């Protein structure tokens, strides 16, 4: 999200937050 963060897990990333 814009005020979230990117969590890298293996070969993919998850964009969390609003």
Swiss-Prot record:
Major role in the synthesis of nucleoside triphosphates other than ATP. The ATP gamma phosphate is transferred to the NDP beta phosphate via a ping-pong mechanism, using a phosphorylated active-site intermediate. GO terms for biological process: nucleotide metabolic process. Belongs to the NDK family. Its cofactor is Mg(2+). Keywords: ATP-binding, Kinase, Magnesium, Metal-binding, Nucleotide metabolism, Nucleotide-binding, Phosphoprotein, Transferase. GO terms for molecular function: ATP binding; metal ion binding; nucleoside diphosphate kinase activity. It catalyses: a 2'-deoxyribonucleoside 5'-diphosphate + ATP = a 2'-deoxyribonucleoside 5'-triphosphate + ADP; a ribonucleoside 5'-diphosphate + ATP = a ribonucleoside 5'-triphosphate + ADP. This is Nucleoside diphosphate kinase 1. Its EC number is 2.7.4.6.
């Amino acid at each position: 999200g814009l005020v979230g963060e990117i969590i890298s897990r293996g070969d993919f990333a998850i964009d969390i937050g609003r």
